[in-house]
Amino acid sequence: MLKHWRNRAAALGLSLCLVGALCPVAQAVGPEVSAQSAVVLTADTGAVLFEKDGHTPQPVASTTKIMTALLALEAAQEQGDPLVDITQEMVAVEGSSMGLQAGDSISLTGLAAGMLLASGNDAANAAALYLDGSLESFAARMNQRAAALGMEDTHFVTPSGLDGEDAQGLGHLSTAYDMALLARAALEDQAFRQLCSSPSLAVEFAEPVKRVTYTNHNKLLAQYQGCVGVKTGFTKEAGRCLVSAAERDGALLIAVTLNAPNDWQDHTALLDYGFSQVEPYQLAGGDVRLTVPVVGSPVEVVSLRGSNGGEVTLPLGQGAQVERVVHAPKFLYAPVESGEQVGEICWYLEGQLLGSAPLTAAGAAPLQEKAPSLWERLFG
């Protein structure tokens, strides 16, 4: 039905722009937090609601496992969730553990659960070594994904988040803002979201055959209404680190604190503040009605109709700054099918795409039948 609508149009000359007056948005006083760095943003649009030193690179401890678990889950989905045979090299790591032993056999998804609930460094190492053969190669995979997500001030060295340096002397560092970007991407993966939002989870081992129940270290799952994750972390150098997410009235917010002595209290204050600073905004396009001429059809014009693009979460007062752009062709070539997408409606805020919806043909325009030739008229 789509038929590459952009290629069918002679020109997208009817780009209609509808935008409200640009109004300054009053900024409320943000919360006092113990964290050295903190960020709160909306998950759907990425709008920053609060920031404290959010772009300074520093150690992020086990919140690193958000990346490791996401990569493991993606590989599990691609490879049919293979079993990982645990080796001594995989479990030779200090710190928190899911209790793996050499000779165990467990799925990649089971390892991801061990990372996100028990914060297992052994699980992180096992996934890294299984997927890429060495911790260095897996770190390259992590950094490649970080770059793709726009994590400009991040450099990963270890899959677990333990402090370390690579061969070039670069440390394992990220920022509160970058970790929020990572959480935003990870929460779009339903398997990841299910794991990190589970207060506890039973994980099956294939060898030896057993079931082990792990309890999530994230106290906010029980303490904060609507909390859906994400990951705790601590090392002596990083201090207490926490990435959280909570959902309320359709709005999903992400909060990050790094080096926060009172991280639980910080996140309660940050999320409460964030929810007080947002409102839903409907990407309305159902009112769009246009007509365009059709070439090569007995139907001379076709009506086009827009559709709504759903609902997004915006900072208070910024709905007036949303720009709606209607991309419609100057004309169409027959045949045109009813319901066929022939254009697009896009919504932007400060140049960032908030969403899009199809512009479709409200009626059909069949191809003009070829006139019979003289021979066909005489002898047909």
Indicate residue ranges for each PLM-predicted region.
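Bacterial N-terminal signal peptides that target proteins for export
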Residues: 2-13
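Hydrophobic alpha-helical segments, especially transmembrane helices
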Residues: 7-9, 66, 248
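C-terminal segment of classical bacterial N-terminal signal peptides
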Residues: 16-27
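Active-site-adjacent loops and short helices of periplasmic peptidoglycan-processing enzymes
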Residues: 26-190
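Domain-terminus/edge residues, biased toward the C-terminal soluble/receptor-binding domains
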Residues: 168-380
